[in-house]
Regions:
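Short, active-site-adjacent cap segments at secondary-structure transitions
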Residues: 126, 173-174
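Structural motif
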Residues: 68, 163-165
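Flexible, membrane-associating and regulatory peripheral segments of lipid-active enzymes
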Residues: 17-99, 103, 108-109
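Bacterial Sec-dependent N-terminal signal peptides
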Residues: 1-22
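Short glycine-enriched nucleophile-adjacent loop
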Residues: 177-184
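Gly/Ala-rich beta-loop-alpha elbow adjacent to hydrolase catalytic centers
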Residues: 168, 172
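Active-site catalytic motif of lipid deacylating hydrolases and related acyltransferases
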Residues: 73-163
Length: 186
């Protein structure tokens, strides 16, 4: 009996051990380069750049759609070992996730509602929400600054007075809440 308790204690210690990853506080010198939304490559999706996979969801001609959909995607930067507060938009792994997971399985739901606009942005790491005082707040504000700039470019370059649907999920909703406040609240 005592031997079994000893094994249980050893197993409990083994299973409770985990690697500790020390996250540095947010520092401005480590901020990825800001995107220029006048350049099409800084958008995951524009109506002129729909992928063949995305076009499969179309049931109406894109020119017949009466509204635009500005979609801000959810948190994808979740790996514990990734110590960056914000992912650069040129990160190919992040781009792959945006295009092949989020756009195809979430944003595509809006493809028959309006022309789809999805900007890449310097997304904050998931830990930002639990470490607001250590740098999370700064990381989220940086991400929002990209979403806001993308929306400003969208309004000036693409909107042409069309109705707008603002759609989002997870971290994207954190940012669109402020977007609605900054652009639509009186």
């Amino acid at each position: 009996m005592i031997k079994n308790i000893g094994y249980f204690i050893v197993l409990a210690f083994l299973f409770s051990c985990k690697a500790v990853i020390k996250v540095q506080e947010f520092q401005n010198k480590e901020v990825p380069e800001a995107p220029n939304y006048l350049n099409e490559e800084n958008w995951a999706v524009l109506p002129s750049t729909y992928s063949l996979d995305l076009k499969e969801f179309e049931t109406k001609s894109i020119d017949s759609l009466k509204a635009d959909v500005f979609y801000v995607y959810p948190t994808l930067n979740t790996a514990k070992e990734d110590l960056r507060w914000n992912a650069p938009i040129a990160d190919l792994e992040q781009q792959y996730k945006v295009l092949n997971k989020v756009v195809l399985f979430q944003a595509s739901a809006f493809i028959t509602s309006g022309k789809l606009y999805v900007p890449y942005y310097r997304q904050a790491h998931l830990r930002s929400y639990s470490m607001l005082e250590k740098g999370g707040k700064k990381a989220l504000l940086l991400a929002y600054s990209d979403v806001k700039k993308a929306f400003e470019v969208y309004l000036k370059k693409y909107n042409n007075g069309r109705p707008i649907i603002i759609a989002s999920h997870s971290q994207g909703s954190t940012h669109t809440k402020f977007l609605l406040r900054d652009f639509f609240d009186d």
